């Protein structure tokens, strides 16, 4: 595991502020938004569809804390772009939006460095103000929308209105206390992690923040490599994973196979009270990965010799299957959902940090074993040939 302290030069202009929103392209936006509200504690924020004059695409926007998810679907049978995306990838993340300052400058610099500009800067407005946008292409079919608010005071973005319906059940369910997007992870095919991470360093002036390789993260069967890139202020963190060759197909390779290439593997959501959050998410019916039971026995032994003290009761963490990772300065608590759709692609993470800025490297091996058990149930923990090809494919 390597942590990097060199951020490089501070960009003179064009600051990246934070994650603005994540857009999912799904088969049924209404149902997807409802699922995330009832299961995960989001609330309807905004809507765009036929009733608001949007004739091609319908979008339901949901929010929890500062986390904003947009679920979009095609309204017409001739929408080839969204239709093809759905067939290839299934329901999943299409766009990760960043709120920025000086969108024009960021686009100009990215263009000079060779980035593909999907859509040049444009402005949208309504009676509540103006917003400037631009869209860049990153890994796979994923895009980044840059969002520059020009004194905009609306609930979300121009063209969106208040949700047409508020589910009366939502107010009766326990609060989940998820506050902010901590990081968003992209999975790449083998040998594409470096080029995907370099894209951020070159085109967006991000820097390397953290990394692990397959000598540090591996089980008997499979392994991964990961690099985390971040903006100068480190308010946006983007881990990039790739599978490393092993005896069996790794969970990263399984993702790439079912997603039809690179894409967003998981979104980590931060909370200040993970015990209450997970209790309530479990009560709402969210399914989580369970690590082997030996994990907590080993954890108790290791913590006896650790320099830090975990404030939370380990018995409760074990009951809820929350994981702990630590160093000499602090610790983090984390847990991962099972896939959010039938394809074993996108899942979510809930994380709480106590003076610890890592990504749970100490848990990777236990998690990999948990992932492998799930893979085996799906019939996907298959042998790899010496050349890295899955046998029997």
UniProtKB/Swiss-Prot annotation:
N-acetylthreonine: residues carrying this PTM: 2
Major localization listed first in the record, in broad terms: cytoplasm
Entry's family note: Belongs to the 4HPPD family.
Protein name: 4-hydroxyphenylpyruvate dioxygenase
Modified residues (Phosphoserine): 211, 226, 250
Gene assigned in the entry: HPD
Pathway the protein takes part in: Amino-acid degradation; L-phenylalanine degradation; acetoacetate and fumarate from L-phenylalanine: step 3/6
Reactions accelerated catalytically: 3-(4-hydroxyphenyl)pyruvate + O2 = homogentisate + CO2
Gene Ontology cellular-component terms listed: endoplasmic reticulum membrane; Golgi membrane
Domain of life: Eukaryota
């Amino acid at each position: 595991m390597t942590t990097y302290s060199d951020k490089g030069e501070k960009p003179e202009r064009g600051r990246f502020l934070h994650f603005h929103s994540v857009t999912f392209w799904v088969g049924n936006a209404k149902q997807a938004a409802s699922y995330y509200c009832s299961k995960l504690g989001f609330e309807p924020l905004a809507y765009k569809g036929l009733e608001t004059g949007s004739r091609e695409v319908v979008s339901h926007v949901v929010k929890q804390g500062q986390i904003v998810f947009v679920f979009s679907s095609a309204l017409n049978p001739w929408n080839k772009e969204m239709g093809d995306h759905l067939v290839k990838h299934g329901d999943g993340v299409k766009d990760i939006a960043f709120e920025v300052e000086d969108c024009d400058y960021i686009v100009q610099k990215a263009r000079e460095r060779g980035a593909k500009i999907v859509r040049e800067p444009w402005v949208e407005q309504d009676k509540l103000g103006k917003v400037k946008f631009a869209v860049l292409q990153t890994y796979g079919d994923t895009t980044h929308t840059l969002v520059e608010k020009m004194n905009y005071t609306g609930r979300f973005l121009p063209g969106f209105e208040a949700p047409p319906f508020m589910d009366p059940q939502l107010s009766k369910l326990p609060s989940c206390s998820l506050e902010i997007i901590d990081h968003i992870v992209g999975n790449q095919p083998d040998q594409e992690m470096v080029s995907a991470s370099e894209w951020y360093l070159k085109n967006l002036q991000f820097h390397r923040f953290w990394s692990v390789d397959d000598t540090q993260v591996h089980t008997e069967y499979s392994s991964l490599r990961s690099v985390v890139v971040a903006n100068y202020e480190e308010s946006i963190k983007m881990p990039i994973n790739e599978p490393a060759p092993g005896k069996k197909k790794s969970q990263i390779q399984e993702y790439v196979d079912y997603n039809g290439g690179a894409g967003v593997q998981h979104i980590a959501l931060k909370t200040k009270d993970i015990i209450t959050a997970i209790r309530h998410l479990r009560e709402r019916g969210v399914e989580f990965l369970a690590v082997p039971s030996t994990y907590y026995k080993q954890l108790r032994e290791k913590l006896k010799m650790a320099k830090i003290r975990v404030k939370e009761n380990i018995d409760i963490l074990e009951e809820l299957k929350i994981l702990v990772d630590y160093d000499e300065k602090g610790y983090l608590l984390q847990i991962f959902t099972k896939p959010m759709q039938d394809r074993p692609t996108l899942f979510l993470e809930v994380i709480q940090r106590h003076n610890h800025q890592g990504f749970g490297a100490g848990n990777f091996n236990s998690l990999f074993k948990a992932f492998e058990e799930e893979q085996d149930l799906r019939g996907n923990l298959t042998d790899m040939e010496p050349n890295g090809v899955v046998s029997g494919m």
